[in-house]
Amino acid sequence: FVGYDPKLEISCRNYEVKITDAFGVRRFSSSPQKYIRQILEDYRSPKNDALPDFTGGLVGFFGYDYARYSVKGFEPQSQDDAHFKDVDLMLFDKVLAFDNKKGTVFLIANMRTDEPQANYKAACREIEIMRGILENDKPARLKKPCLKSAMKPLFDADQYGEMVLKAKEHIKEGDIFQVVLSNRYEAEFEGSLFYTYRELCRLNPSPYMFYFSSGDIELAGASPETLVKLKDGRLFTYPLAGTRKRGADESEDEKLQKELLEDEKELAEHN
C-alpha cells in the first residue's frame, strides 16, 4: 500500500495536539484521543470485497508514551531524550494498492457523499492523476545512504546486564511476568532512508514492512510478525516466539523442533 498527499495530519507530544489540513494548522492542549476518534468517525469507507483490505484511512505510529492518554494515572518515568512524538498519524484518501502475487495495482480515491456527482468526478480525476504518475514518472534517483559515524549503543554490555538482573528481580517479586528490554543504537546518517527501505525489501522481504515520512522523521522496518490485524470487525494476531538454529540434517531439525515445542518459556509466550 502506498499513500500520498495526506488529507490531514494529527500529531501530539506531551498533550500538545497539532492538526494540519487544507484549512491550516490548529493546536490544542489536550489528549489526542478524542480528535483521533472523531477523525475515524468522520472518514469511513464502505466495505467492498472487490478491493484490498485497506482502502484509505489513518497511517502512522503510536509511541510507547502514548499510554499516558489511554491508561488513567500513568505517566512515563523514562527520560525523553529521543524527542519523538507520542503519536503521528496521516489521513490518506488516495491509495495505490499493489498485489505482488497477481501483478496488479489498485488505484483508490475516496470521496465524500454530500455532493455525490461533483465528488465522484473529482475522485475520477484523482485516479487519472495516479495513473499518470505510474505511467509517466521516472523512478526517483535516491542518494545512497551513508553512516557518518560509528553506531553507538545507549547502554554498554555491563549496563544492559544490570537491566536484565533487575528485570529478573521484578519477575521474582511478582511485579511483572514479562518484559522486553531494548538498546537503542545511534549514528550520524546522510541520505534517504527510503533507499535503505528498498534494500530491506529486496534482501529481507517480510509479511510486515513499512516506511513512513513526516517532516524530519523517517521510519522504516521489516518484521516476520504482524502484531495485530483488524478485519471484518475481528482482531487477528500472529505471535512469533522462540527460535532455534537450523540443524545440520533433518534428524537434528526434528530434535530442535521437539525441544522448542516442549520449552515452558516459549509456550508461555503464546498464551
Cite the ranges covered by each PLM segment.
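Extended alpha-helical targeting/anchoring segments
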Residues: 1-271
